[in-house]
């Protein structure tokens, strides 16, 4: 079976199962599932799987593979292999997910300037990213290493057209001592930022927060390859849809403007549709963008201040991607039944003098 046929069959099968509300091996075009003796993944006859990364496995840099793998992307390596950059959504109190081992015994093997937050040597950031080099011909892992160290709660993010991964911290925490998850937690740095990881890096990148992209509980990012604008989601009940306009297309540390989406004809639109249908399904609405100030705040209130400025409110913005001049995003608990919403933002480049999509429509 060709890959395209497999994907089409799997998709159609999934749609039929969803429509019928049942899951049955008789309805599958691939046959009955066979029990996996390792109790990891049951597959039909003729299918197999390969584990290329496993929590607590020893990596090539001498550190352990962190737990809680989350958002990731694959990049073409210069040698023909594939580099997979993977987030790890870990809290610093969760020592058992750490790359440094449970007692931080491996922490001294990493240069201090490559650890964003060492947590005074007690509770370093246990999130960050790992990079896996994979040989698609031999179907095996070549090497794996930490590529971003000392951050926390790295949830989703997004790949850039210039070959990097934007790793998003889904948290908002401050330096100091606190008691979390029944443990004393020490932090040296502020968290709630986006970090850029070069997918070709053979070791950890210097961890530099992109402060111009805002400090809030980041979820995911999608890059408009034409303009370089970056769209950002926020996983909160009262979240905004953000847009970052970089001063230089592929140099995010050079700063830029952070904005939030607003409905042109109704200020502070609540798109959640919890109490009433403010936004009708399938109907296009003209939008504009509101410039935000104090984007690196001391309080986790950027979304609240943006709403007061007229920005639209979303119900837990999460997944986001760019395709064919549009940006698609999901709101996890939107809608009357709180089962989720999908939005499409159509970029209108004709009204833009700087090709940044200064106006557009959303449905």
Can you describe what each PLM-predicted range is?
Residues 1-7:
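Twin-arginine (Tat) signal peptide motif
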Residues 9-18, 23-318, 322-363:
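Conserved small-residue
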